[in-house]
Amino acid sequence: MGGCIPFLKAARALCPRIMPPLLLLSAFIFLVSVLGGAPGHNPDRRTKMVSIHSLSELERLKLQETAYHELVARHFLSEFKPDRALPIDRPNTLDKWFLILRGQQRAVSHKTFGISLEEVLVNEFTRRKHLELTATMQVEEATGQAAGRRRGNVVRRVFGRIRRFFSRRRNEPTLPREFTRRGRRGAVSVDSLAELEDGALLLQTLQLSKISFPIGQRLLGSKRKMSLNPIAKQIPQVVEACCQFIEKHGLSAVGIFTLEYSVQRVRQLREEFDQGLDVVLDDNQNVHDVAALLKEFFRDMKDSLLPDDLYMSFLLTATLKPQDQLSALQLLVYLMPPCHSDTLERLLKALHKITENCEDSIGIDGQLVPGNRMTSTNLALVFGSALLKKGKFGKRESRKTKLGIDHYVASVNVVRAMIDNWDVLFQVPPHIQRQVAKRVWKSSPEALDFIRRRNLRKIQSARIKMEEDALLSDPVETSAEARAAVLAQSKPSDEGSSEEPAVPSGTARSHDDEEGAGNPPIPEQDRPLLRVPREKEAKTGVSYFFP
């Protein structure tokens, strides 16, 4: 506005009549640019908070860019680099050739404890694919009848593998492409293609599914193309199994995560997970042993669940007010890798359920149900140092930044706030949604249009499903009752009679409730027999946003 003052003075000196329109135009531009709209315009009314898992990979990238710039403006990122290196997809070349020269083959790793989270997911994915391939080969060998036919199948498989080996791309990573973050979700899925109304949009969709961006615009430095599909959740098997068992059997266990446990049974479970076995936690397991196993997984993990380069940024949120702390934690969660944020959400969900049962309550049968005595503060004391580990980046930041309070106390405060507000941390507020949409539109308007149309189809399908569920929950009256209701309304009653016409129960309604007092009543036969409750219509939980 300061640069417009000389122009307004010159315009006033030349022509005083144009001053009022210029002032109105300047005020309108100021409202649109600074406040985000004209007076009375509130875009938040039609926009709701959406889950971070409903965003596509492209939207997740723009969300990270938005969170990065927001945190930089608040001076929360000191050592975090936008172009930080990703985990290497290929193994060490020297180690690889050394094993080849020695005639040894690298065994498939099944380890789960004591390694990084990315390596845990890689091992699980590789083990699952190996089991599927082994089962397929066994089925093929079992279906062969004659020896010649089996010999032909073996020769065909060998030549097929040789052909695929020489025809593959040389720059293909060693890890499965479906797992690596660089090659994940490279095209539109079959479900997305099935949602298209006509085949004319097929080519456009395939082109939009592989949008490329300059390296300078990529927050995480990935060179591969982004997808318009959401990212699948990536949670280790041991975390999911332990959380499910605790939610089923441990909500009423007093002092969970703090009482003594059997070291031998925990070591046995740990060895089973490290061997790649399909471990099933049944009712015979002790809940304290499972809780200790979950705690050991995060404590012995090679990296920190909350990234090391964001260590000091998380601790700085402990010095803020509760509302400001929650907003800063949201932005920091957006910057986390998807596998870390998914695992953190699963853990916080289980811990929050434990805190909901910390106090004594009365059961359905009227008996007193003792609480587990584990509040969010007690759980934060247990998991504070396990989730926030100080690595080399954290040590460097701690020397540069003076926090003012002890790091352990700050970590407990941060973890407690995350447990209490776990459901809000992984939601995207409306004003962040608009910024993400603007960034997507600047990079590719066609991609934003495709995302809008897909979200609109999701809303329509959710409404149809809601109406079907409402019809199933509110069954239609039998034909005899409906016919009796119509006859009762159409039959004239005697003027001197004080008796009301016989109407089956459930058909008569108060006119003051629907038509309003003083208005003529609507005949019952004109009303539809099938009605969808309005309160159920607002519980779809599906939303989309516009810039």
Swiss-Prot record:
Keyword Signal found: yes
Feature: compositional bias, Basic and acidic residues: 524-539
Residues with site note (Arginine finger): T258
Chain segments carrying region Disordered: 485-547
Record-linked SUPFAM superfamilies: GTPase activation domain, GAP
Tissue specificity of this protein: Detected in the outer root sheath of hair follicles at the level of the stem cell bulge, during the anagen and telogen phases of hair growth (at protein level).
Signal sequence residues: 1-40
GO molecular-function term, one example from the UniProt record: GTPase activator activity
Parts forming coiled coils: none
Biological-process GO terms, alphabetical: signal transduction
Taxonomic superkingdom: Eukaryota
Domain Rho-GAP: 226-426
Pfam families named in the record: RhoGAP
Database matches in InterPro entries: ARHGAP6_RhoGAP, Rho_GTPase_activation_prot, RHOGAP6/36, RhoGAP_dom
Role noted for this protein: GTPase activator for the Rho-type GTPases by converting them to an inactive GDP-bound state.
PANTHER family: RHO GTPASE-ACTIVATING PROTEIN 36 (PTHR12635:SF8), RHO-GTPASE-ACTIVATING PROTEIN 6 FAMILY MEMBER (PTHR12635)
Disorder: Bazex-Dupre-Christol syndrome: An X-linked dominant disorder characterized by a triad of congenital hypotrichosis, follicular atrophoderma affecting the dorsa of the hands and feet, the face and extensor surfaces of the elbows or knees, and the development of basocellular neoplasms including basal cell nevi and basal cell carcinomas from the second decade onwards.
The protein's assembly and partners: May interacts (via the Rho-GAP domain) with the active form of RAC1.
Name assigned to this protein: Rho GTPase-activating protein 36
Originating organism: Homo sapiens (Human)
